[in-house]
Amino acid sequence: MIKEISWEEIQYVWANYLWPDRTSSIQTHSAMCFLGGHDMKNKDTKATFLGYFVDSQLVGVNSGHGCVETAHIGSNYRSRGLYVHVQYRGKGYGTELLNATGLVAKQQGYTIMWSYPKNSSWHTYNKAGFVLESDWHPSETGTNAYASCKLE
């Protein structure tokens, strides 16, 4: 079951499992813009934190927030921080979390959702309808690329 969770719950998972070696601070929002650049105005939008629960145990997370319009994409929503605990992978929970994040974005009026996934999780994003929008390149947290999907 997917439900909204608190910042503290998702931050714990991100800091301890998804990005344990990250040197920059982990915050509720990302200033990243689609296909490059940063804009602090992204932090003016509402962030939503989602958790996937099995038998009342939190086994996966994802978040999303609106981003400033760019010439590349217009009104857009960032999916960020997808993580499913190792023993629960391969069951479709990551895809369900991405789809639930897309539903939140659509309900808020967004038509495009984008992310910056690690190459190790690309298959999950592809199953959820994302297409690659850039080449893969090293980042602070792994090898990543920009990807997007239309919310219809």
Kindly label every feature range from the protein language model.
Residues 51, 57-70, 76-78, 83:
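Conserved beta-strand in the GNAT
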Residues 88, 92-100:
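Conserved acetyl-CoA pyrophosphate-binding loop and the N-cap/start of the following alpha-helix
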Residues 97, 121-124:
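Conserved short alpha-helix immediately C-terminal to the canonical SAM/SAH-binding motif I
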Residues 14-54:
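Active-site rim helix/loop that mediates acceptor-substrate recognition in acyltransferases
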Residues 114-116, 131-149:
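Conserved catalytic-core motifs of GNAT/GCN5-like acyltransferases
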Residues 105-118:
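Conserved GNAT acetyl-CoA-binding A-motif
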Residues 1-13:
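A short beta-loop-alpha structural element at the N-terminal edge
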Residues 14, 125-126, 130:
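Conserved active-site tyrosine of GNAT-family acetyltransferases
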